């Protein structure tokens, strides 16, 4: 009888562990679209982020009430790292176009997520995706400077280092030029293409 209850307890804990993570992955995948171009600055985060936050709060309330502290820690530890790496993966593979306002929206999404995560996981942060968005905001020169300073790996650690390869860094740089390449003036487009191509070569050299 005791072993049966222990097996049931283990099954429940594993289910809770997987449930919150699948909810996170689904919500973040919904949040990151192929195009995040917003006409005007928005004061509220993406609806999918608000929904995710609601789920996180409800989940944390239930689990912290009924699950012992050691098991609670096992269920909730690593949620921030999961979000950070998955968002970085989505933005470096799925995202095809983003403007300044779209980037600002994503940064707001991160801020809201991070504040909520700190109530669940001590010291929770999203450093890698924050760096990606900060570099987009800073522009192509900052991306090239980062590649020059850190070379292969882009100064990241662990799985993030493996994700932000030379090709992904180039993709980030190309994202910063999307708006300029839509300019109606042909000479402006040609100039932007020249600058982009030269900087792509620099990234190849620095991250080889």
Spans of model-derived segments:
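Extended alpha-helical "rod" scaffolds
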Residues: 1-208
């Amino acid at each position: 009888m005791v072993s049966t209850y222990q097996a049931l307890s283990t099954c429940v804990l594993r289910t809770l562990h997987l449930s919150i993570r699948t909810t996170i992955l689904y919500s973040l995948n919904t949040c990151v679209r192929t195009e995040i171009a917003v006409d005007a600055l928005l004061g509220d985060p993406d609806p999918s982020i608000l929904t995710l936050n609601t789920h996180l709060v409800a989940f944390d309330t239930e689990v912290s009430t009924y699950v012992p502290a050691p098991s609670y820690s096992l269920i909730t530890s690593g949620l921030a790292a999961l979000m950070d790496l998955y968002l970085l993966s989505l933005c470096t593979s799925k995202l095809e176009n983003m403007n300044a306002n779209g980037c600002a929206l994503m940064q707001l999404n991160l801020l809201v997520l991070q504040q909520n995560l700190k109530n669940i996981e001590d010291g929770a942060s999203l450093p890698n995706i924050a760096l990606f968005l900060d570099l987009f905001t800073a522009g192509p020169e900052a991306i090239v400077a980062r590649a020059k300073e850190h070379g292969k790996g882009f100064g990241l650690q662990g799985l993030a280092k493996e994700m932000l390869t030379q090709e992904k860094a180039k993709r980030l740089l190309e994202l910063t030029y999307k708006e300029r390449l839509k300019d109606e003036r042909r000479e402006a487009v040609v100039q932007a293409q020249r600058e982009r191509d030269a900087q792509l070569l620099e990234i190849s050299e620095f991250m080889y």
